[in-house]
A protein has these predicted regions:
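Hydrophobic transmembrane alpha-helices and their immediate loop junctions
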Residues: 1-196
Length: 196
């Protein structure tokens, strides 16, 4: 089995296992499928942004009751770009939650609105600036971009200015705050949806 075939088999197997675990846990296969699809959408946000930056990226690997992850190597990539890759997952997951919310509202489906609530909640929590979470990766990228010297010197002579890099840090930080606010607004708007 080739490396990519193994990745596809792992994706399918771990997706199915997560689907079964969530379906049994919530007692509804539709909810289980929707929840695992929301996680998949989140991970494909990372994949699309990583590929947009020319990186090789793995297919998602699901971990039942925890989530999923993708791997990529970002050596040489500007820190603000790695921050964007980190934020792309919660952004895509938030869009998926909005779609579930719209469908749930249109069809008066409590389980879809509850699915949207959990999508907003988990993506918002994932933005906490902590360690391995996406928020931690974004925060590190912003801080590392900002902390680079604004002017680089060689032998006492200024040779390069990185003001554009610092402006990127500000732009990514604004995106971070706006995304977090949007996800929290989604949590608050759907929190009384009740169990399905």
């Amino acid at each position: 089995m080739t490396g990519r075939a193994r990745e596809v088999a792992t994706l399918i197997g771990t997706f199915f296992l997560s689907f079964v675990v969530v379906s049994v846990g919530f007692g509804d296969w539709r909810f289980g499928l929707g929840f695992v699809l929301l996680i998949l959408v989140h991970e494909f946000g990372h994949i699309i942004e990583a590929k947009r930056n020319g990186l090789e990226v793995s297919l998602p690997v699901f971990i039942p009751l925890i989530g999923a992850y993708v791997t990529y190597r970002h050596s040489g990539l500007a820190p603000w770009r790695t921050a964007l890759i980190s934020l792309a997952g919660p952004l895509a997951g938030g869009i998926g939650a909005v779609i579930a919310w719209a469908a749930g509202s249109h069809y008066a489906s409590h389980w879809l609105v509850y699915l949207a609530y959990l999508g907003f909640l988990f993506n918002a929590a994932n933005l906490l600036p902590v360690g391995f979470l996406d928020g931690g990766g974004a925060f590190r990228g912003i801080v590392n971009t900002w902390s680079r010297p604004a002017i680089r010197y060689e032998d006492g002579v200024p040779v390069a200015a990185s003001a554009p890099e610092r402006s990127r840090a500000v732009q990514v930080a604004v995106l971070y705050v706006v995304l977090a606010a949007g996800l929290v607004a989604g949590v608050l708007a759907t929190r009384h949806s009740g169990a399905f």
